[in-house]
Amino acid sequence: VEAAKRGARVTAVDLSATLISIARERLPSHIGQGSIDFRVGDMSSMELGEFDHVVAMDSLIHYDVADGIRVLAGLADRVRGSILFTHAPSTVLLELMHASGKLFPRGDRSPAIQPVSERRLQKMIARERCLQRWHRGRMQRINRGFYISQACELLPG
């Protein structure tokens, strides 16, 4: 919404039709000169076209780490500017929470995440051919109560 308020044409994608519906309902009546095109689908779909920037907030945390890197690589071929994404950092607290979550019956658990250390993530990014022209930009740890993630920026060049 903030990008649209600043004039951007935003494509908002999620696999969940329910979440897209909620996002549409919560959209403010006035978003300035920009626009938001809500779509149910896979953010890695080539049909979405090219982008100036990509923000994958809490999307890749639900992928196996290697699959998440492949998604980033696929996006990188279609992005002219930056890629911002979050991942679940490998911390003692998060590893304990992740392990204890496995004790509950499957229906009572939140969606699976796979914590990964920053070092391992950066090595995997560096080894991915399609990401070799990209370099790490800003990094920011987000820690709010039980929510922990690591925001990462990839920049071309």
Indicate residue ranges for each PLM-predicted region.
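Class I SAM-dependent methyltransferase SAM/SAH-binding core
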Residues: 1-45
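Hydrophobic adenine-recognition pocket in adenosine-nucleotide-binding enzymes
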Residues: 59
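A short, conserved alpha-helix within the catalytic core of class I
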Residues: 63-75
